[in-house]
Amino acid sequence: MNATLRILAWLIAVALVALPVVAVLNGWVGAERWPLARLRVSGDFKRVPAEELRAVVLPYARSGFFAVKLQDAQDAIARLPWVESAQVRKRWPDVLEVHVVEHKPFARWGTDRMLSEQGRLFRTPPLLKDFKLPQLGGPDAKTQEVVALYNESRALFAPTGLDVERLEMDARGSWSLGLSNGVQIVIGRDDARARLQRFARVLPQLTDPQRPIARADLRYTNGFTVERRMENGESGMDKKPKPVPPAAPHALVLNSLRLRTPLLTIPHSPFAIPGFKT
């Protein structure tokens, strides 16, 4: 009996010591005695409003040094638009440190997302302004492949003074591309790079300011078709002879042309080929 009483007394003594410690560490009592008085924010970010960040962090900081839930605060910050990742730490006696990594947009992806320079997809933030970005698209697992062809396409069309504004791959793997002068190009599924090389090589010969190209279809083994804008605004198939090798109806045969890929660097293209920056 005496042994039982001794054990019970020992447990009560331990509880009396442990409960205050647990209460303090969980913020049940004394939170106001160890308040987090300072917020220290770091990171290279420009689009996350400081007021919005402060409003998200403040409720967690009020719980005090011992009771603040760092992971919950970190998750809340990461849900803000433009935030790629966040780290939250506390430093004795009263500092809450927040490090924010912001998404750096590279392109629009599909209808409602963007692709960052790190190759991550994220929702398009609301009230997006002043962003002139290329329109890319495709299966989520194909982002590297889409970006690689985008970079190569820019190099191919750079000598013509044109840029690539749109490049998309559909669910079947078929490619389409839009140039800065409004020309829409259907590439198809196979040999996309070779087909674009052929078209870019002869594009200067097809220039006609009076009848600009509206659309090109490259889904042919040895050539392509071209539709031009007519004076009435409509488009039609190009049947006018060009100083190029003999052509089948509506198709320019390119077997006899010697093709070269221009050795160019792409300005303002943050992706390395074939992968993303790390």
Swiss-Prot record:
Domain POTRA positions: 34-103
GO cellular component terms listed in the entry, alphabetical order: cell division site; FtsQBL complex; plasma membrane
Cell compartment(s), UniProt: Cell inner membrane
Record-annotated membrane-spanning stretches: 7-27
Chain ranges on the Cytoplasmic side, renumbered to this chain: 1-6
Topology, Periplasmic side: 28-278
The keyword Nucleotide-binding appears for this protein: no
Pfam families named in the record: FtsQ_DivIB_C, POTRA_1
Membrane association type: Single-pass type II membrane protein
Gene3D superfamilies (alphabetical): Cell division protein FtsQ/DivIB, membrane protein fhac
InterPro entries, per database record: Cell_div_FtsQ/DivIB_C (IPR005548), FtsQ (IPR026579), FtsQ_C_sf (IPR045335), POTRA (IPR034746), POTRA_FtsQ_type (IPR013685)
Chief subcellular location: membrane
GO biological process, one term: FtsZ-dependent cytokinesis
Keywords annotated in UniProt: Cell cycle, Cell division, Cell inner membrane, Cell membrane, Membrane, Transmembrane, Transmembrane helix
Record flagged with keyword Cell membrane: yes
HAMAP family in the record: FtsQ_subfam
Subunit structure: Part of a complex composed of FtsB, FtsL and FtsQ.
Family: Belongs to the FtsQ/DivIB family. FtsQ subfamily.
Function: Essential cell division protein. May link together the upstream cell division proteins, which are predominantly cytoplasmic, with the downstream cell division proteins, which are predominantly periplasmic. May control correct divisome assembly.
Protein name in the entry: Cell division protein FtsQ
Organism: Xanthomonas campestris pv. campestris (strain ATCC 33913 / DSM 3586 / NCPPB 528 / LMG 568 / P 25)
Upper classification of the organism: Bacteria, Pseudomonadati, Pseudomonadota, Gammaproteobacteria, Lysobacterales
